[in-house]
């Protein structure tokens, strides 16, 4: 016996279970350290706290175990079990079942399950005192049960019972049908149910319990009648007022007549889930459970023996034990609550509480008189709440929370959360004082007992993150409904430790105790009235998107930053800044973009100034709500602070979009835009610019106003535009008033210094090239511990004491080229904080009394997790915050600011991020040439050399006195339109009959070049642009000089990549400048005409000029200003023409195509290789790859310059014959026919633009007239991937289908099997084709056909999609007997089955099982669900437009929706769709009657499709005259053939989906289909 006890104790110790003895009147206890046994992330507490231990009563001792092999749960299966109040134990491996219609009664007192027990439908409600599910146990019930007090048992000191305690395994409580119904009010006592029910299921014995805004805790009404399965009439209660819109009805008799769990005991029961239990509760009524009241927690206290920590000598029973809620879940991540009705009767703490769990809540109705509807304790890092309705009667006496006792959630909250991630979608909150209450725990690590209190998932540092971090907070609240019906009472107040709710009701209350730095909260698609957001985020950010706020909405509390996007307010939100903490006044930085603010008629809006540079407030003021229904502001330019050079022109633009087609829509004949300036006469600022009022007529075609603005003085302009009806007689009547962001006008700036980041490797270590997806990292600590020249961060970036860098720096190389352009390889290395949220500080020496322009280039690599990554920038310790939306993919950002340095020797720039945003480089510009104070050139050179060994960076000193320097960093807020230099018209074929005197043959050898590598970087230098900067402080960088643009241009720079590869020469230098001669403006942005025939100019600086410059260098250096640098007006980056780091290896010439026209022109001349030494002409490059180190951008113009040299003493004429423009690309040159003198070198520039995804391998003919020689220059360009395809890359196979539109082919594109829909150009509706291309290009979903691309040209019009091996659903179910074609008036464009390897042929119909049909229907519904979420109505849903990919019902994907030619995108302001499109037998009433329709038209079509698939008959086949179908559908008639033979649930779903009114959404349809499928499966 002693041996057995020893083994048992060892097993318990191994499992972490400790047995605790108690006084004899109590159950003995078991103790588990919940964090060690339940938290499976490999992290152990650093501090052992009492709440880490989990105690529970050992009620399973002395229970009766089942007889081995017994399967029926009856008395005889348990030896010597009593008839009533038995204490039973189902052993491990035993599987027992209660028989249907079995009456258990009071058979069970205590039931412990280590095996499994299943209670099927039909078992009479039974009683139970304690249900314990042990690890590995499984309890499943589809019938009701009641809790009762334990009989003849010891006392449970921890108050778990009566109730359920799970320690692992699974708990499934599943009801067979819905128990609650949503309803719309028809009258005080009449309602329309949103779900069809059987009227015969109810009689006068039933009661209808109604819950609404006026009856939060419900009222019971008499059941009168149900007509048509939808219309409910009640009586014997108060009428529901018309103001109530959220109405739910619960039918019940005395015995409920539904699946329920309630308590018949003297005290309520509770359900306690622990130990990673799998929980699924659905369609159950949890009634009057929950023991924990809303009073302060008073837990049971165990008094241990001083000499034995396993012996409890006394117990003080707690009066309010925590966590005894209706449902408490801890350490369980697979928890689903769906379509339940949870009602509590006492004033409880909360019916639902979660601790270190991630629950999914869907479609539940939660009614309570409690402190909170749901409480998420710490560790519950994700709550997914969808379509739930939370009704709450706030407590009359909320208690003061106790931080030390973890006592929270008493205020009357909807959701009370101590965790950072909250996701609510279309939830309803009724009656709560605070709908969402988020509270940070002060000193959270100490409370939880972890060094790093990680928000799930908690994981070690990756190459990007060097340590464990706390994730940012992300609140995603999408389309919720909030209703507060208690009025402005004062009986309920918030008594949080740091905030007091004096407004009675808040949408959101956020309490930041200072433990979490710099958090970003986001809200989306709110619609609220008389609500308030209260926040205490002195170092946090709140982002609000798509908010519609009426009445007196406001935001109160303290914020560091507020972002408002795409929202509508009745008044400007009165941001309250008077909330102080420790007596410190806290300020708010606000950005407001694309948002509407109501201003009453007669009131003039006051311009809201941005608090700091970078924040933008540009509301659209309106004084009539009907204006929003007429037209809205689509975009404005500029939309953020903008800078322009003096005397240059900027096009101020307002684009509108109409939102209705009524006759009240303003016409362009009477809408004008009045542009004026706002000057504050009281302001002390002397450089505010004033302009006279200018009226601009609205463009009738483009729907915009464009105001060309040119200012000839420096200063700031505050511009206001009033959009109004010029014929209006009311002085104060207008449509919109817009205050543009401040525009700054200044003189030309020039390049000053540049910094980039490169790695410093030890001389003893070899560098490895890493993948762009796996960046290498070198932390500060690692560098500091190494030797030799690798301690790059030791000295910061010191260069002549001009630059220092803080220690909190981690260097990462091989960042991805997020712009898909090799021109940005400068930005592929960067620095980020070692410690997240701790600043990286850079201190730069600058000259006094000058104005500087700074550019910071950041690369966002990849998300650390699914949460946001905000970026904060500080200048001289002052915040420089920009509106920075969430980023979920690699991206690139450029931030520009100006700094007037009056009397400082340096500037401090710092930034804060989570560790996934990298500062990759920085550029500094000034109005005047700036030089550092330094000694002679030798010492400067010495310092530079020294710094490259130990410092991180090198600052470029720019003191050249004879060469002009401009770095073309082209960045603008609107992405600058493309420069395209068009090819010359018709190529002239020049034939020279002069006899060649020196004939030689060329050899097919690989081309070579004498060009030396000018891209080598100094391996020991941390910060640099290129090594040319470092060679001589008095020498201008040649590469930057060659990138110079024409300084005389007053336009912002075009996005043209310009690369020069001309070799240097002792006597000559070449400065190329390609500037467009003709330009136009579109929408306020620069757009260069593609039809311009003007040539670009090439300026050639002679040696004479160079000599003059050299003779006067010392005198001109300090006097001459550098060329004007194009301004960087905002945060959006276009291409930057920088030097390339490397080139792709050359390929043999034979893969290049030669145009036939070129061959004809050159057929009579002799061919020579371009590098043949016998010909007098020498090319610096014979293969033009335009400097592409990677694939190029489509529609981007790239310019490449080479040099041609005449080695002989004879002049020659050269003719360049270019490939003819085609649909793939356009190439041109600045000089097609030219003379080259003896010994002369001449630059030639080529420009190319690719129009689609293609590989452009062409040859340019070069003819030497006098010698009758010719050669070729090869063009090698490959574009990035896009949806615009090259027709020549499509391989056509057999025809799959055809119609009047054209044909569908099976084919290949780049070895991928695809379907090619080839249109007959000129015979199809181009609008439908373009609409289909546009929609398919926007959407990606597994149940929507994948769009590969398209071909659009004068000759070809194709849509390329993925290929379906089986074919359409119509052909699958009907085969060759597809009769429905006779019922349609449209031609199907289905891709039919042509794959001989498939097991299913579409030549004949295939008999599908019910499971297969349901699986296909689920995929169709999921596809439609996604389309509707994207705002797309398909409008032609039918079997022929559903492609089948697999008929195995267990396959990942079985079906996909196709054919979007008739689809339509919608928006929330305009849903008046009346076009009659689609196929008649699938058209809803609204379409047939040409009435307004919405998403429900697809629901109706789905119902007909689903019906057709289930019965395998053509719909309406019982009607002989097909022309009668529309009138019958309009009258309410629906197909009946075979409908009654279907499964009841399937039949009901079809009836609901094609009902005349109140059709379900596809969210509900998917849910219903999945439930039906599971039943069949």
From Swiss-Prot:
One of its GO terms (molecular function) is protein serine/threonine kinase activity. The gene is gdt9. It is a single-pass type I membrane protein. Residues 998-1014 have a biased composition (Basic and acidic residues). InterPro entries: GDT_regulator, Ig-like_fold, Kinase-like_dom_sf, Prot_kinase_dom, Ser-Thr/Tyr_kinase_cat_dom, Ser/Thr_kinase_AS, STKINASEGDT. Keywords: ATP-binding, Kinase, Membrane, Nucleotide-binding, Serine/threonine-protein kinase, Signal, Transferase, Transmembrane, Transmembrane helix. It catalyses: L-seryl-[protein] + ATP = O-phospho-L-seryl-[protein] + ADP + H(+); L-threonyl-[protein] + ATP = O-phospho-L-threonyl-[protein] + ADP + H(+). Residues 998-1019, 1050-1128 are annotated as: Disordered. Residues 1-16 form the signal peptide. ATP binds at residues 1296-1304, 1317. Residues 1091-1115 have a biased composition (Low complexity). Its main location: membrane. Residues 1050-1082 have a biased composition (Polar residues). GO terms for biological process: regulation of developmental process. Its EC number is 2.7.11.1. This is Probable serine/threonine-protein kinase gdt9. The chain crosses the membrane at residues 967-987. Residues 17-966 are extracellular. The active site is at residue 1436. One of its GO terms (cellular component) is membrane. It comes from Dictyostelium discoideum (Social amoeba). It is found in: Membrane. Residues 1290-1573 form the Protein kinase domain.
């Amino acid at each position: 016996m002693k041996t057995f006890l020893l083994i048992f104790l060892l097993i318990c110790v191994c499992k972490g279970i400790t047995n605790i003895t108690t006084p004899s009147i109590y159950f003995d206890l078991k103790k588990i350290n919940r964090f060690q046994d339940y938290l499976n992330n490999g992290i152990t507490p650093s501090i052992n706290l009492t709440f880490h231990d989990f105690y529970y009563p050992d009620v399973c001792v002395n229970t009766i175990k089942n007889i081995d092999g017994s399967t029926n749960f009856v008395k005889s299966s348990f030896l010597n079990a009593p008839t009533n109040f038995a204490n039973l134990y189902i052993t491990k491996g035993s599987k027992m079942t209660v028989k249907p219609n079995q009456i258990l009664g009071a058979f069970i007192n205590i039931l412990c399950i280590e095996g499994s027990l299943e209670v099927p439908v039909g078992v009479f409600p039974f009683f139970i005192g304690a249900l314990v599910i042990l690890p590995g146990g499984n309890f499943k019930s589809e019938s009701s049960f009641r809790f009762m007090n334990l009989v003849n048992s010891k006392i449970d000191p921890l108050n778990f019972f009566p109730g359920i305690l799970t320690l692992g395994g699974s708990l499934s409580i599943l009801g067979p049908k819905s128990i609650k119904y949503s309803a719309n009010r028809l009258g005080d006592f009449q309602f329309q149910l949103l779900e069809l029910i059987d009227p015969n299921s109810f009689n006068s014995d039933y009661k209808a319990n109604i819950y609404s805004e006026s009856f939060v805790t419900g009222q019971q009404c008499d059941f009168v009648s149900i007509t048509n399965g939808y219309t409910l009439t009640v009586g014997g209660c108060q009428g529901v007022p018309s103001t109530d819109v959220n109405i739910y009805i619960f039918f019940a008799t005395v015995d409920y007549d539904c699946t329920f769990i309630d308590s018949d005991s003297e005290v309520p029961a509770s359900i306690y889930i622990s130990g990673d239990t799998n929980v699924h509760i659905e369609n159950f009524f949890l009634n009057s459970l929950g023991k924990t009241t809303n009073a302060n927690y008073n837990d049971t206290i165990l008094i241990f023996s001083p000499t034995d920590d396993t012996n409890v000598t006394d117990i003080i029973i707690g009066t309010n034990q925590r966590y005894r809620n209706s449902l408490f879940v801890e350490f369980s991540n697979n928890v689903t609550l769906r379509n339940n009705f949870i009602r509590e009767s006492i004033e409880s703490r909360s019916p639902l509480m979660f601790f270190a769990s991630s629950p999914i809540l869907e479609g539940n109705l939660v009614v309570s008189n409690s402190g909170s509807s749901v409480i998420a304790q710490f560790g519950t890092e994700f709550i997914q709440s969808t379509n739930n309705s939370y009704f709450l009667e706030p407590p009359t006496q909320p208690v003061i929370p106790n931080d030390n006792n973890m006592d929270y959630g008493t205020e009357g909250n909807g959701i009370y959360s101590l965790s950072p991630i909250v996701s609510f979608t279309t939830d309803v909150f009724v009656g709560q004082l605070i709908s969402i209450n988020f509270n940070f725990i002060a000193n959270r690590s100490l409370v939880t007992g972890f060094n790093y209190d990680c928000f799930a998932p908690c994981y070690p540092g990756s190459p990007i993150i060097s340590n464990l971090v706390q994730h940012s907070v992300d609140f995603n609240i999408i389309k919720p409904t909030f209703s507060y019906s208690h009025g402005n009472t004062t009986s309920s107040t918030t008594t949080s430790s740091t905030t007091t709710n004096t407004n009675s009701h808040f949408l959101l209350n956020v309490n930041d105790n200072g433990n979490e730095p710099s958090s970003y909260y986001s809200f989306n698609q709110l619609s609220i009235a008389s609500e308030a957001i209260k926040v205490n985020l002195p170092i946090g950010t709140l982002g609000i998107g798509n908010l519609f706020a009426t009445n007196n909405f406001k935001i109160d509390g303290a914020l560091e930053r507020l972002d408002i996007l795409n929202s509508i307010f009745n008044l400007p939100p009165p941001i309250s800044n008077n909330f102080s903490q420790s007596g410190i006044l806290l300020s708010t930085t606000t950005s407001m973009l694309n948002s509407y603010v109501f201003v009453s008629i007669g009131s003039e809006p006051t311009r809201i100034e941005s608090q700091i540079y970078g924040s933008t407030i540009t509301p659209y003021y309106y004084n009539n709500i009907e204006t929003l229904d007429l037209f809205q502001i689509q975009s404005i330019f500029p939309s953020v602070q903008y800078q322009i050079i003096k005397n240059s022109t900027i096009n101020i633009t307002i684009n509108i979009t109409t939102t209705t087609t009524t006759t009240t829509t303003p016409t362009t004949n009477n809408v004008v835009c009045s542009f004026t300036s706002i000057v504050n006469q009281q302001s002390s600022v002397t450089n505010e610019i004033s302009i006279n009022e200018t009226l601009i007529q609205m463009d009738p075609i483009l729907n915009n106003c464009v105001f060309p603005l040119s200012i000839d003085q420096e200063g700031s302009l505050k511009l206001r535009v009033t959009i109004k009806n010029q014929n209006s007689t009311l002085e104060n009547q207008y449509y919109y008033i817009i205050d543009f962001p401040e525009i700054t006008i200044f003189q030309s700036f020039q390049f000053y210094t540049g910094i980039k980041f490169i790695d410093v490797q030890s001389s003893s270590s070899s560098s490895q090239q890493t993948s762009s997806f796996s960046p290498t990292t070198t932390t500060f600590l690692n560098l500091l511990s190494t030797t030799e020249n690798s301690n790059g961060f030791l000295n910061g970036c010191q260069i002549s004491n001009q630059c220092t860098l803080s220690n909190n720096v981690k260097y990462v190389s091989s960042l991805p080229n997020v712009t898909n352009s090799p021109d940005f390889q400068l930005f592929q290395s960067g620095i980020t904080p070692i410690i997240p949220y701790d600043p990286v500080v850079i201190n730069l020496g600058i000259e006094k009394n000058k104005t500087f322009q700074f550019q910071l280039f950041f690369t966002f690599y990849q998300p650390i997790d699914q949460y946001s990554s905000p970026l904060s920038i500080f200048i001289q310790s002052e915040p420089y915050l920009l509106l920075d939306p969430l980023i979920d993919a690699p991206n690139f950002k450029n931030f520009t600011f100006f700094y007037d340095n009056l009397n400082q020797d340096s500037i401090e720039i710092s930034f804060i991020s989570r560790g996934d945003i990298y500062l990759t480089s920085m550029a500094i510009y000034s109005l005047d040439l700036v030089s550092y104070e330094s000694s002679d050139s030798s010492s400067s050179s010495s310092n530079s050399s020294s710094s490259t060994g130990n410092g991180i960076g090198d600052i470029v000193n720019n003191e050249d006195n004879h060469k002009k320097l401009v770095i073309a960093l082209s960045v603008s807020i609107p992405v600058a339109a493309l420069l395209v230099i068009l090819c010359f018209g018709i190529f002239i074929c020049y034939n020279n009959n002069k006899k060649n005197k020196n004939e030689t043959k060329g050899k097919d050898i690989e081309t070579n070049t004498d060009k030396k590598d000018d891209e080598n970087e100094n391996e020991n230098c941390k910060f640099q642009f290129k090594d040319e900067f470092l060679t001589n402080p008095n020498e201008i960088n040649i590469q930057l000089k060659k990138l110079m643009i024409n300084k005389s241009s007053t336009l912002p720079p075009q996005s043209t990549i310009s690369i020069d590869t001309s070799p240097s020469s002792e006597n000559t230098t070449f400065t190329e400048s390609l500037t467009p001669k003709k330009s136009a403006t579109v929408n306020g942005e620069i757009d260069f005409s593609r039809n311009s025939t003007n040539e670009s100019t090439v300026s050639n600086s002679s040696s004479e000029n160079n000599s003059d410059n050299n003779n006067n260098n010392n005198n001109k250096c300090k006097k001459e200003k550098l060329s004007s640098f194009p301004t960087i007006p905002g945060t959006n980056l276009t291409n930057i023409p920088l030097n390339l780091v490397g080139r792709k290896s050359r390929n043999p010439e034979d893969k290049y195509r030669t145009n036939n026209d070129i061959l004809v022109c050159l057929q009579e001349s002799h061919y020579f290789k371009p590098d043949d030494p016998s010909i007098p002409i020498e090319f610096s490059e014979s293969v033009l790859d335009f400097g592409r180190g990677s694939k190029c951008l489509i529609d981007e113009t790239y310019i490449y310059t080479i040099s041609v040299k005449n080695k002989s003493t004879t002049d020659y004429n050269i003719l360049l014959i270019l490939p003819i423009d085609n649909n793939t690309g356009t190439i041109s040159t600045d000089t097609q026919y030219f003379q080259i003198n003896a010994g002369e070198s001449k630059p030639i520039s080529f420009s190319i633009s690719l129009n689609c995804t293609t590989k452009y391998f062409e040859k340019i003919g070069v003819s030497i007239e006098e010698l009758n020689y010719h050669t070729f220059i090869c063009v090698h360009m490959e574009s990035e991937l896009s949806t615009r395809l090259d027709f020549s890359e499509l391989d056509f196979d057999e025809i799959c289908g055809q119609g009047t539109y054209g044909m569908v082919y099976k084919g290949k594109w780049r070895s991928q099997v695809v379907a090619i829909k080839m249109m007959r150009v000129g015979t199809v509706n181009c609008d439908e084709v373009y609409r289909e291309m546009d929609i398919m290009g926007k959407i990606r979903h597994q149940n929507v056909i994948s769009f590969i691309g398209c071909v659009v040209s004068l000759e070809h019009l194709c849509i390329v999609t993925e290929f379906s091996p089986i074919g359409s659903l119509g052909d699958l179910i009907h085969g060759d007997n597809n009769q429905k074609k006779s019922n349609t008036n449209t031609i199907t464009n289905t891709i039919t089955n042509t794959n001989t390897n498939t097991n299913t042929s579409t030549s004949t119909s295939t008999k599908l099982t019910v499971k297969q049909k349901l699986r296909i229907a689920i995929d169709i519904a999921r596809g439609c669900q996604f389309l509707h979420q994207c705002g797309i109505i398909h409008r032609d849903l039918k079997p022929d437009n559903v492609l089948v990919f697999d008929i195995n019902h267990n396959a990942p994907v079985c079906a996909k929706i196709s054919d979007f030619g008739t689809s339509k995108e919608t928006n929330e302001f305009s849903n008046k769709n009346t076009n009659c499109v689609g196929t008649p037998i699938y058209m809803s009433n609204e379409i047939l009657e040409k009435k307004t329709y919405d998403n429900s038209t697809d629901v109706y079509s789905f119902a007909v499709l689903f019906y057709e698939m289930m019965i395998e008959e053509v719909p309406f086949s019982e009607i002989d005259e097909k022309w009668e179908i529309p009138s019958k559908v309009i009258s309410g008639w629906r197909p009946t053939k075979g409908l009654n033979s279907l499964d009841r649930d399937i039949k009901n779903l079809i009836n609901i989906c094609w009902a005349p009114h109140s059709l379900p959404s596809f969210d509900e349809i998917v849910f219903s289909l999945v439930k039906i499928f599971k039943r069949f499966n």
